[in-house]
Amino acid sequence: MSLFRGIRTASILLTVGTLIFAATDALAASAPMSVSQLMLYQGADRETILVQGAKKEGQVVFYNSHTWFKAVAQEFEKKYPFIKVAEWRAEGADVMKRAVEESQAGRFLADVVESTAGNIGGIHSNGLLQEHRSPELRFFDDDVTKKGKSGVYYWADRETYISLGFNTSHIPAAEAPKRLNDLLDPKWKGKMSLAGGGTAARWVGAVVEMAGREFIEKLSVQNINVHNLSGAALANLVVTGEVPMSPTIFDSNIFVAKRKGAPVEWRPLDPVVANVGYSGILAKAPHPHAALLFIDYLHSKEGQQFIVKGGLSSPRDDVESLVNQKFKKTYFEAKYSVEEYEKKLSEWEELIQKVLVRRR
């Protein structure tokens, strides 16, 4: 009898222990997660948790620097009608400035920020971005993510490419340059222009890193006009024919103009500079559940397809962009820190002034 009694006692103790562990697990599962835990959570119930939390939050505040995000925000609201997207848009430098100044003032208003490399990098270097994970990350190459210990701080959501744009009324496609060395042909003397500021500097930097400073020296005899204009503004001059061609034109500007019937073409001449927009979640985001849902949607196949409709290219592996991307891309932000990149930009801008402007 004592043997059976012992077995029964052990069985009861085992059952009680199992119940205690089960109860402990249930309490752990139901316990609220910290924001940092939520940002890295990848459980099967992640979507449910985010939706429940977002319904209570009711909105996501999105600071960005590109007009096309309005369409993405509208589609997001259709999918999640209980979340209102409050959008603030400005130049990239102003997005960074506002995010930093609000943080310094203890005003935490924004959830998600989006801008190009230097600006998003500046926000990150101030310690303002939250490391996070997303099921969509598997569709993005490491070159377009800023990795942390367990997730990413920011990752690409759009790309445009800087290379040759030309007016076909002045330069037939069959005659236009097809390789970088073709720009040295004497027949292009006086017909080429560069944009101002960082757009031209990045192109010159890519050329220097691939072909050496000597190529820029050779290019100087072509009497290149350097305009104090953005890439988009210079593209408008290509559209009108005032500028026959330029190797510092964004593909997106040409594709949008071409849709409207303009006689223009864009051609990738290696190396092609990738101009990348990145997005991240602020560490003090007031609506963390909605922020994660938004960043998921922005990088989802559906969200990226809306980006492409706006004339941009997608860094996502399974989304087809407007331009055949079988060309060498230069990602400066993957090669240099923010500080190194700023130093390089200054060097390249000085090279433009010294070799292409002052020698004319």
Q: Which residues are covered by each model-predicted region?
A:
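Bacterial N-terminal signal peptides
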Residues: 10-25
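Short, polar/charged alpha-helical segment
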Residues: 44-55, 65-84
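Extracytoplasmic ligand-binding site segments that recognize negatively charged/polar headgroups
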Residues: 63-74, 85-103, 108-242
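A ligand-binding cleft/hinge motif common to bilobed small-molecule-binding domains
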Residues: 119-122, 244-263
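Periplasmic-binding protein-like
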Residues: 139-142, 160-161, 188-195, 199, 218-221, 225-228, 298-320, ...
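A bilobed periplasmic-binding-protein/Venus flytrap-type ligand-binding module shared by bacterial periplasmic
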Residues: 163-170, 275-290, 306-307
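Extracellular/periplasmic bilobal clamshell ligand-binding domains
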Residues: 321-360
